[in-house]
Design a protein with these regions (language model features):
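Secreted/luminal cysteine- and crosslink-motif detector
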Residues: 11-12, 110, 148
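Hydrophobic h-region of N-terminal signal peptides that target proteins for export
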Residues: 5-18
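Generic secondary-structure transition motif, activating predominantly at the C-termini of alpha-helices
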Residues: 13, 70-77, 137, 141
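Surface-exposed amphipathic alpha-helical segments
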Residues: 22-32, 117-149
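Conserved polar/disulfide-associated segments of primarily extracytoplasmic proteins
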Residues: 32-116, 121-127
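Secreted/extracellular small peptides and ectodomain modules produced from precursors
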Residues: 8-9, 107, 145
């Protein structure tokens, strides 16, 4: 009986740790096509090859966290239809070259690093990609305290 109670106690105590695990942001079945250690950039492509996800990291100046954020959030030739910004992140979405793009940039590693994620996919994939975009956007906020690779 004590053995069973001990096992149950261990299971209960491990629940918060499991709940705080970082979410996997790369969708299942996507293939990595680029891994550049120098620029800390990785690119993934959907199984059908129509959608892509690019992720990269750059150092952040803790004293000027917001300086220059708009410069990296916006690009020429894009029609922005969605923009949200907070002190530690910015999200931009819209159309570019006939495709939909979604870009989110947020502070990570206790404010010492910017994490960038950008998805691009055809307009007709919007409904299919909505869940993926939402999962990635929400999941990125869980990396603020993470200083891993």
């Amino acid at each position: 009986m004590l053995k069973i109670l001990g096992i149950l106690l261990c299971c209960v105590l491990s629940l918060p740790a499991q709940a705080e695990e970082r979410p996997r942001l790369i969708p299942p079945g996507w293939t990595q096509t680029v891994a550049d250690r120098e620029t800390r950039t990785r690119k993934f492509v959907s199984p059908d090859g129509q959608a892509s996800l690019t992720a990269r990291q750059v150092s952040a100046d803790a004293g000027a966290a917001n300086r220059g954020l708009d410069r990296v959030a916006y690009r020429d030739g894009e029609q922005v239809t969605y923009h949200r910004r907070a002190p530690s992140w910015v999200a931009v979405s819209g159309y570019r070259d006939g495709n939909i793009f979604y870009r989110k940039i947020n502070l990570a590693c206790h404010g010492t690093r910017w994490n960038f994620v950008e998805l691009e996919y055809p307009r007709d994939m919007k409904r299919a990609m909505d869940t993926t975009v939402t999962h990635i956007a929400r999941g990125m906020t869980r990396y603020y305290d993470d200083c891993g690779r």
